[in-house]
């Protein structure tokens, strides 16, 4: 099997090799959280809204899509019903109201009546020197002259300048894949933060994307080495507060499960290392951005990264 890497698993390993192990090797379950489910619901509504004619893409229309999309999600994953007491109309309404607040914030940032996305929830994949890179792009806008804008929705808050690079890694990863697929560097990468009502934009060039390519290749070498050595060390950081496996983490007094005999195979299994989710962000990342938003905003950001607040 050809090895594969998704931006989510790449980000896991960069954040903490033990987190990568818990997710890819041990495959520990991670119950859905309200933040994750709300993010998925909001994504679904923003995606479906573009099925409507341009003039009909209103706040009210988006609100009307919420119950149907929620029902579809629960049908597909019945365990989600544990997150919301649907027998209590007030709680159900409150759940939809929370999602609607995020959607309404989106309307302050973008005008869907003036957008015609070329693609929504676009699966992208390319192979670079024997490593498959894959992921889902929330939205791809293509201008008549071929310029591409890659858009990703985040239901958390925008990161501080200190963490913008981390937030943009995923977008540059997609830009690299699109560049390899179409022979053209996307003109703009745009992260839409619905939690704080901010846009983070970046205009990549070939130099950037070559650097991302080197980084991804080096990351895969590091993953292979960790798998061969069975050495997935914890890397504690403030993001540990959002780690669903903290109680098992030796850095916090826990005991990790014994590493499986076939850990090497599991760690490099492309179905896990290249796993992609149609979800806004794992719960840890969503919460992390909330925390990061309170970090030191005086830190210098990338010179071509722009935040519209
Ligand atoms: S708690 Fe922190 S150090 Fe431990 S596995 Fe999770 S992210 Fe890694």
What are the residue ranges of the model-derived segments?
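Charged, glycine-rich intrinsically disordered N-terminal tails and low-complexity linkers that flank
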Residues: 1-48, 306-309
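Metal-dependent nuclease catalytic regions and adjoining charged, substrate-binding loops involved
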Residues: 4, 145, 177-309
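Active-site-adjacent bridging/hinge elements
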Residues: 14-22, 144-152, 217
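Short, polar/flexible loop-turn hinges at active-site or ligand-entry regions and domain interfaces
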Residues: 26-35, 51-57, 160-161, 229-232
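Hydrophobic (often cysteine-bearing) scaffold residues that line and stabilize catalytic clefts
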Residues: 34, 38, 42, 95, ...
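Mg2+/Mn2+-dependent nuclease catalytic core
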Residues: 122-214
């Amino acid at each position: 099997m050809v090895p594969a890497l998704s931006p989510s698993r790449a980000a896991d390993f960069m954040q903490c090799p033990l987190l990568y192990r818990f997710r890819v090797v041990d495959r520990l379950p991670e119950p859905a959280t309200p933040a994750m489910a709300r993010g998925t619901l909001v994504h679904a509504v923003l995606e479906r809204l573009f099925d409507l004619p341009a003039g009909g893409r209103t706040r009210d229309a988006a609100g009307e899509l919420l119950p149907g999309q929620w029902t579809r999600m629960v049908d597909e994953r019945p365990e989600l019903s544990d997150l919301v007491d649907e027998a209590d109309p007030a709680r159900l309404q409150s759940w939809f109201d929370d999602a609607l607040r995020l959607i309404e914030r989106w309307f302050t940032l973008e005008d869907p009546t003036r957008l015609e996305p070329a693609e929504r929830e676009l699966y992208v994949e390319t192979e670079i020197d024997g490593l498959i890179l894959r992921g889902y792009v929330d939205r791809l806008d293509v201008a008549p002259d071929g310029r591409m804008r890659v858009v990703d929705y985040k239901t958390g808050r925008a990161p501080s300048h200190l963490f913008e690079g981390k937030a943009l890694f995923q977008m540059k990863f997609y830009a690299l894949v699109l560049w390899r697929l179409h022979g053209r560097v996307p003109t703009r990468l745009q992260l839409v933060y619905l939690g704080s009502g901010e846009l983070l934009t970046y205009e990549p060039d070939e130099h950037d994307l070559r650097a991302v390519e080197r980084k991804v290749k080096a990351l895969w070498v590091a993953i292979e080495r960790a798998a061969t050595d069975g050495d997935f060390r914890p890397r504690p950081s403030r993001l540990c507060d959002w780690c669903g496996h903290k109680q098992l983490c030796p850095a916090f007094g826990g005991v990790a499960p014994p590493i499986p005999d076939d850990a090497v195979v599991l760690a490099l299994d492309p179905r896990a290392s290249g796993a992609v989710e149609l979800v806004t962000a794992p719960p840890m990342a969503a919460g992390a951005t909330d925390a990061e938003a309170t970090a030191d905003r005086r830190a210098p950001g990338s010179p071509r990264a722009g935040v519209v607040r």
